């Protein structure tokens, strides 16, 4: 197994798919990284040489991935909550942030339904 950005990449998958195991890299960014490193997208990880892996590592290092990206997202949400803006309040209350309805649905975000006893 190759190791890129602290993540073990599966050997028997195509490199384009294998790169998506890294948090912050999807299919489009994987293609961008591979084209910049001059590597074919349909190669298997086990067929890639060490110099090619180094080129991929250097390209991936240019992006914010894994722990740094998670920290950045967490800090952005925390900043919104500290500002007290609408989105921050919605995050704080555990409600949907992007304008979805909450009279019905939104159970994933709000948690299990609380029964009202009379």
UniProtKB/Swiss-Prot annotation:
Residues 94-118 are annotated as: Disordered. One of its GO terms (biological process) is translation. InterPro entries: Rbsml_uS13_C (IPR027437), Ribosomal_uS13 (IPR001892), Ribosomal_uS13-like_H2TH (IPR010979), Ribosomal_uS13_bac-type (IPR019980), Ribosomal_uS13_CS (IPR018269). GO terms for cellular component: cytosol; small ribosomal subunit. Belongs to the universal ribosomal protein uS13 family. Part of the 30S ribosomal subunit. Forms a loose heterodimer with protein S19. Forms two bridges to the 50S subunit in the 70S ribosome. This is Small ribosomal subunit protein uS13. It comes from Acidithiobacillus ferrooxidans (strain ATCC 23270 / DSM 14882 / CIP 104768 / NCIMB 8455) (Ferrobacillus ferrooxidans (strain ATCC 23270)). The gene is rpsM.
């Amino acid at each position: 197994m190759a190791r890129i950005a602290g993540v073990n990449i599966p050997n028997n998958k195509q490199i384009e798919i294998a790169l998506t195991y890294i948090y912050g890299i999807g299919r489009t960014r994987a293609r961008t990284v591979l084209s910049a490193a001059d590597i074919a997208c349909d190669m298997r990880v086990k067929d890639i040489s060490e110099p090619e892996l180094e080129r991929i590592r250097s390209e991936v290092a240019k992006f914010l991935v894994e722990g740094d990206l998670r920290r950045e997202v967490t800090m952005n949400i925390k900043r919104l909550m500290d500002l007290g803006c609408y989105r921050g309040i919605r995050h704080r209350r555990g409600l949907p942030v992007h304008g979805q309805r909450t009279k019905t649905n939104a159970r994933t975000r709000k948690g299990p339904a609380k029964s009202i006893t009379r």
